[in-house]
Amino acid sequence: MQQSLITKWLSISCIMVIAMIVIGGITRLTGSGLSIVEWRPITGILPPLSFEAWQVEFAKYKAFPEYNYVNYRMTLSQFKFIYLLEFIHRLLGRITALIYIVPLIYFYFKGIIKNRDIAPYIIALLLLYVQGFMGWYMVKSGLLNNPSVSHLRLAFHLIIAVIIYHILFYQLIKNRCDILLILSQTDLKLPLRFSSVAITVIYLQIFLGALVAGLDAGLIYNSFPLMGDNFIPTAIKDNFFDLKNWYDPVFIQCIHRLGGYSVFLVVMALATYLLKIEHPKLNKIAYFLIIALLMQISTGIITLLYSVPIIIASTHQFFAIVLLSVIIWCYFLIKTSK
């Protein structure tokens, strides 16, 4: 009964974090992230409820660079759309925090979560607070002279969310898996290493994807597999390792593509090895890996070819989390097998 409660709580928490990631991506893609120019963690739980309140919020927005340089023709109704998207994103963050924190306190003081098991939950809790600060730190970067958020802060904001999800999802499968795999006759060192490498590569790829979004790098070189006439554009070939390239949309798109090839090779190698083991659960994971990988790659290519349609781009981001989840599941089963 107690384990069932924790499983339900962790499942809901994981779903909420995924929703936060996807809605955060939509907020970025629609240019809604700078519509709320204040950070009010407690008092900002309600949207404007009258015409006058909307006028006040719109007037605040007009005082900042995004309106003056980009959206100077925006109407109040258009402002309401971007404001509500950002508001939903922030509200969902508050709800996610409550859904996580309140049961955590209850489970701990009731002794359902023991002292020996509390560490990952505390780390996730601390990261939730860091994430809230990082979100505002990111928004603040776009309220200065440049009407665009820092792509680096955006990437770290996303990665913190992914780490929180990783911790919670790992605890979820740890609570749900009562029976360990019996694979004593099989050498699992190689697939365990592949799993670790795959997780690392996907983290890097998610980080790069956030940089692409932050620099609008998906709106250039809308061709595949070449970037224009070359695999690597001549504009960056000569100074490929220059640190200034991290602010160059061409370079960022190029290494995000290269990262995609790396993900494909590592995940396919892992799936191939799992299929050779001939264990039904690991074989099932291998098929899930292949499906998630193909969905991730295909949505990425379509996103590029069609200049970042919001639905496809959001689906691409979602399948990055799905693919990561399957690999975490794989890593857990192999690591805990005997």
Curated annotation (Swiss-Prot):
It is a multi-pass membrane protein. It holds the Pfam family COX15-CtaA. GO terms for molecular function: metal ion binding; oxidoreductase activity, acting on NAD(P)H, heme protein as acceptor. Pathway: Porphyrin-containing compound metabolism; heme A biosynthesis; heme A from heme O: step 1/1. InterPro entries: COX15/CtaA_fam (IPR003780), HemeA_Synthase_type2 (IPR023754). Keywords: Cell membrane, Heme biosynthesis, Iron, Membrane, Metal-binding, Oxidoreductase, Transmembrane, Transmembrane helix. Its cofactor is heme b. It catalyses: Fe(II)-heme o + 2 A + H2O = Fe(II)-heme a + 2 AH2. Its main location: membrane. It comes from the Bacteria. It is found in: Cell membrane. GO terms for biological process: heme A biosynthetic process. One of its GO terms (cellular component) is plasma membrane. Interacts with CtaB. Belongs to the COX15/CtaA family. Type 2 subfamily. This is Heme A synthase. It comes from Rickettsia canadensis (strain McKiel).
